[in-house]
Amino acid sequence: EGILTGMTRTTKRAEIVRAGLDCIAYQITDVVKAMSEESGIAIGELRVDGGPTKNKYLMQFQSDIADVSVQVPSAEELSGIGAAYAAGIAAGIYNREEVFGQMSRTKFSPKMDVSERNKKYQGWKAAVEQVLTD
């Protein structure tokens, strides 16, 4: 079940697509906040991989809405590479600094004003609440 709010007769297809991208960032932000609250550890950086990392708008919005830096590696899919490096580090073939120091990354830093971030996030929470209470 889902909900689209704030649509009018003039809402364009691109705005709906952007809303879908925004939802990815909001959901990840919800998870990051829950992890931080449960662990008591502030999360200041996300290291991400996968297909959505190609979308610069999404990566910047993720950084803005979660108020953390987002690090995107030059390699798109790192799950397999990460497993291989972890095994190599555990076996003493690689050292941690050698592996992680070599990876080039694009960094996205939060640029959104705090009041705008809070307004957008509260709008997200209200939309989620609407779905949950219907």
Where are these regions (language model features)?
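Glycine/Thr-rich phosphate-binding loops that ligate phosphate moieties of nucleotide
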Residues: 1-134
